[in-house]
Amino acid sequence: MTYPKRIPINAWSEVHRVARPLIITFDAYNTLYATKLPVMEQYCIVGRKYGIKANPSTLTNNFPHVFKKLKEDYPQYGKYSGIKPEQWWSILIRNVFAPNEIPDEMINEILMRFEGFDSYFVYPDLIKFLKDLKSRHPDVILGIVSNTDPIFYKLLKNIGLFETFSGHIYLSYELNLAKPDRAIFQYALDDIISKQPHLLEKYTREEILQHCFHIGDELKNDLEGAEAAGWTGILLDRNDKYGFLSNSISKPMRDEYKLSIDKIDNNSINTWEANTKQTDTLQLSERKYVVSNLEVLEELFP
C-alpha cells in the first residue's frame, strides 16, 4: 500500500480497519480535555480581580522561556528539587507575570481555577466515542499515558473522567519515564498485562502489541512515540497544526517554542466548531493515523 493514504469517511471498508482493540491509551491535555479560553487570558481574568493589569499576548510570549527554564531548574515538576507540583506551578505563574508583583491569594485562585470545569472543556466527541467503544468492545482496556504531574488526578476526578481510566494511568512524574521514550509505553503494556493476566491466555505479548493504540495531539510524543514502541499511534490534530489533513505537508515542524504556545493558546469552543468539518482520516503508515476528531476515529474501531 502507498502512503500517505487519505480515507474519506464514506469510503471506509474492512480493508482499512485495524485489529480489534485490546488496549487504548490517551494523552491527557488537549486530547481528553482542553481549556475553554487560552490559558493566559484566564490568568489575566483572575489578575484583574487583584488589580493586576497584564496583556494576555505578553504573558503568552513570556510562557515558552519561563516554562523551559523551570523544567531545567526544577525537572519533573520539582520532584527532585524539594518542591511540590503546586509550588512549581506557583513559580511559573509568578514568573510569567513578572515584573508585576502578584499576591499569593491570586496564585491560589489561578491554581484552583485550573482544577475543573471553570477552565476546562471536555470535547463532546470524547464522551460519545468512549460510550460507543465500550458498547462495541466491552473488554477494551482504557488508559492514560501523559507527561504530567499528580495534580492531574484532582482535575480528572472533577471533570468526571477518573473512573473511566482508573487503574491504568501512567504519568511521567510517577514513573520517571516520559514520552516519546518507548519505555513509558512498554511500562504501560507490562503493567496492564500484570493486572489483566487473562490477556496472555489468548495472545503472546507480541500479539497483544498488534492490538494496542495510543491517541494524542503531539506528533513526536504521541504518534511517533507510540509507533516506536510497537503500538499503533493516532494523532488527534483538531487544529491541523501539523498540516497533514489539509495537505499542507510543507507546514513548518512544531519546534519547542511552538509546542509550548500550542499548550496554552487554545480556545476549545472554536476548535470544536472547526474540527467537526474535517471528516477524512490520513493513514501515514501501517501503524500511524491522523484524524481531526473522535467521531471520524469511530470508523477505525467498528
Swiss-Prot record:
The keyword Hydrolase applies. Pfam families: Hydrolase (PF00702). It comes from the Eukaryota. Keywords: Hydrolase. The keyword Signal does not apply. GO terms for molecular function: phosphatase activity. GO terms for cellular component: nucleus. Belongs to the HAD-like hydrolase superfamily. This is Uncharacterized protein YMR130W. It comes from Saccharomyces cerevisiae (strain ATCC 204508 / S288c) (Baker's yeast).
